[in-house]
Amino acid sequence: MTKNKNLEFIQNAIKKNKVVLFMKGTKEMPACGFSGTVVAILNKLGVEFSDINVLFDTALREDLKKFSDWPTFPQLYINGVLVGGCDIAKELYQNGELEKMLKDVVV
C-alpha cells in the first residue's frame, strides 16, 4: 500500500470498528507474546474486536507508528482513540478501567 492508501486504511479501520487491535499475527494465532496478551484480555472481557495483522506489511507498520505516535505493537483502539499497547492494556485490565472503557462499546 502507498502512504496515502495506508493512512486511509488506518483511519477507516479505526472509524468502522469500535474496538480494533493492530497486532502481529491474528486473534486466532498471535505472532508475539504482547499481541497474545491483549487478545487474551479482550477475550476474557468477552469483547468482539477487529484484528489487523501488521506483520507482513512493513510500510503499513511504519505508517501506523507515525499515525499513532506509538512505536510498538500491538496498538489497541477503542472508539477511535489509541488506548496503548500491551503494558497499558494489561494495567487498565488489572485495575478495572479497561472493562469500564469497553462497557459502553456496542460492537
Swiss-Prot record:
A Pfam family per the record: Glutaredoxin
Chain positions recorded as glutathione binding sites: 24, 61, 73, 86-87
InterPro entries assigned to the protein according to its UniProt record, in alphabetical order: Glutaredoxin (IPR002109), GRX_PICOT-like (IPR033658), Monothiol_GRX (IPR014434), Monothiol_GRX-rel (IPR004480), Thioredoxin-like_sf (IPR036249)
Binding-site positions, [2Fe-2S] cluster: 32
An annotated Gene Ontology molecular function: 2 iron, 2 sulfur cluster binding
Keywords noted in UniProt: 2Fe-2S, Iron, Iron-sulfur, Metal-binding, Redox-active center
Chain ranges of the Glutaredoxin domain: 7-107
Stated family: Belongs to the glutaredoxin family. Monothiol subfamily.
Name under which the protein is recorded: Probable monothiol glutaredoxin 2
Lineage: Bacteria, Pseudomonadati, Pseudomonadota, Alphaproteobacteria, Rickettsiales
